[in-house]
């Protein structure tokens, strides 16, 4: 069968790599059209950019500048004791041609953390499936990218992406480590200590990355620790949970966090609870669309195979609805935190990580549901498997059609009034073909040349017109206000103004 046929598994992984590669290529070509930083990229990287301009690649000075940036924002704006350091290394400080590394900085952690999760789960349930973790990681990465509600903030903008996704990715990896430690009695002593230590490190990094990812990490570890402590007398998740709580508190109680939250009109507790509950429910309805159903269909056979593992007892599958309930609570909590502190969920990049939590939670729910059907209700699904086996020649075509559907439709975006648009690789290819990505790049290059002109200490830039604002790549243009004026110190100007601003 497929599950014990290495050649068939290799062919399946190759097909997924081919489809993912073509989609990523369209994204990358579209991304190469945008070669300039934007918005908060300038603010966080002003010190490191100045070091590169004056001293070149002087690593000690760069590290010191990044650390100074980190400390400044920890004390004056946000309690992100890791993220400020990371954001200071915005790739364009070495030259705008390197800004495209953003896509790599986002995709690599996401893919390998998904692989880590899949490996921890799959090899515990069926050690013979060495290639299945790779296939699952490729499929999930593809699905998460194509369905991302705000791709410009999650893939194309360094500050927007790197302030959220790497820490969410680490939370995903931490969930895999927590699952592996649920079976600590079957692990060698060294591996148990390694997993526990890795969980602590990941938790501390997540806590210094973003508060919403930190809260997600705490809740997942709390659930795992509670289940293992009650049912197995297993406390190996407790160190990572303690580190996660310490990291989140260090973030929330930072002086900079107090400064930031004071600038927002936060909602009352009860109001935030109700509003976040309603928004979480609305997102469930909004995101249950055809591409997501395609993903769940593609996951049926591998998940069904894993539910038959003798490692898990039947009682694990008694209440499959708990998977959906836990997913909803996690989404609710992730939306509640910014709603309570800032009065709303804010930018679409935050919805990106809520969307990813939703997708992974539904995959876990599907796993529990399949196990419940076979192992609790006694419904045999072998007949359906045999039918699929008889249709083995047609299944690759069906899978390709589903992947194509995910690549062409994706998920709804969060841009107001533009629900008819879908943020997929198809849209990226379209913007390349009609020249809108090129016009956007040319306009930014012209603006960059003006800002880099040492003969002009005072610069006036014009807003982008409608033809220079491609739907997929464009987020917002520069505007008066403190959030936008990292331009002045970044380029060493006396002043930067906007002409004809409306």
List the predicted regions and their residue ranges.
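Transmembrane alpha-helical segments
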Residues: 110-121, 170-182, 218-227, 297-303, ...
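Short hydrophobic alpha-helices at membrane interfaces in multi-pass membrane enzymes
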Residues: 180-204, 235-239
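Signature aromatic-anchored transmembrane alpha helix within multi-pass, membrane-resident enzymes
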Residues: 194-196, 245, 318-324, 372-418
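Membrane-embedded, lumen/periplasm-facing catalytic core of multi-pass transferases
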Residues: 400-480
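Transmembrane catalytic cores of multi-pass membrane glycosyltransferases
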Residues: 32-101, 158-161, 203, 207-350, ...
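Start-transfer (signal-anchor) and selected internal transmembrane alpha helices
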Residues: 1-27
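Transmembrane-helix motifs of polytopic, lipid-linked glycan transferases
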Residues: 101-130, 134-135, 173
């Amino acid at each position: 069968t497929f599950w014990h046929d290495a050649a068939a598994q290799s062919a399946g992984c190759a097909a997924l790599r081919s489809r993912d590669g073509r989609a990523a290529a369209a994204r990358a070509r579209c991304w190469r059209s945008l070669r300039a930083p934007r918005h908060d990229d300038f603010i966080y990287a002003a010190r490191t950019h100045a070091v590169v301009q004056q001293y070149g690649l002087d690593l000690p000075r760069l590290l010191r500048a990044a650390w100074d940036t980190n400390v400044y924002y920890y004390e004056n704006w946000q309690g992100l004791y890791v993220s400020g350091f990371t954001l200071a290394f915005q790739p364009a400080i070495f030259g705008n041609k390197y800004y495209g590394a953003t896509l790599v900085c986002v995709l690599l952690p996401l893919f390998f953390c998904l692989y880590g999760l899949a490996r921890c789960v799959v090899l515990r349930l069926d050690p013979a499936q060495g290639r299945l973790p790779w296939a699952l990681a490729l499929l999930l990465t593809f699905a998460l990218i194509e369905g991302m509600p705000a791709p410009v903030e999650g893939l194309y903008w360094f500050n927007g992406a790197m302030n959220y996704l790497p820490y969410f990715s680490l939370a995903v990896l931490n969930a895999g480590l927590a699952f592996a430690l649920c079976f600590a009695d079957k692990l060698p002593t060294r591996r148990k200590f390694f997993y526990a230590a890795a969980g602590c490190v990941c938790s501390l990094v997540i806590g210094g990355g973003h508060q919403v990812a930190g809260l997600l990490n705490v809740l997942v570890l709390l659930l795992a620790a509670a289940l293992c402590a009650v049912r197995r007398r297993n406390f190996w998740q407790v160190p990572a949970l303690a580190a996660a709580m310490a990291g989140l508190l260090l973030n929330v109680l930072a002086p900079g966090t107090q400064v930031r939250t004071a600038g927002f009109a936060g909602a009352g507790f009860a109001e935030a609870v109700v509003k976040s509950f309603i928004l979480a429910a609305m997102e469930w309805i909004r995101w249950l669309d055809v591409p997501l159903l395609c993903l769940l269909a593609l996951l049926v056979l591998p998940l069904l195979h894993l539910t038959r593992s003798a490692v898990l007892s039947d009682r694990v599958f008694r209440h499959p609805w708990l998977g959906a309930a836990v997913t909803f609570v996690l989404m609710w909590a992730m939306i509640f935190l910014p709603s309570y502190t800032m009065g709303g969920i804010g930018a679409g990049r935050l919805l990106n990580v809520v969307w990813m939590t939703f997708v992974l939670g539904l995959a876990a729910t599907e796993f529990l549901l399949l196990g419940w059907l076979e192992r609790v209700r006694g419904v045999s699904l072998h007949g359906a498997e045999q039918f699929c086996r008889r249709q083995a020649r047609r299944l690759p075509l069906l899978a390709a059609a589903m992947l194509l559907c995910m690549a062409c439709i994706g998920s709804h975006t969060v841009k107001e009034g533009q629900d008819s648009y879908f943020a997929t690789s198809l849209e990226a290819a379209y913007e390349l073909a009609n020249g809108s990505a090129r016009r956007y790049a040319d306009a930014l290059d012209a603006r960059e040349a003006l800002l880099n002109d040492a003969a002009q200490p005072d610069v006036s830039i014009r807003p982008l017109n409608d033809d220079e604002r491609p739907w997929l790549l464009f987020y917002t243009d520069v505007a008066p206000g403190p959030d936008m004026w990292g331009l002045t110190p970044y380029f060493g100007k006396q002043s930067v103004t906007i002409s004809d601003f409306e």
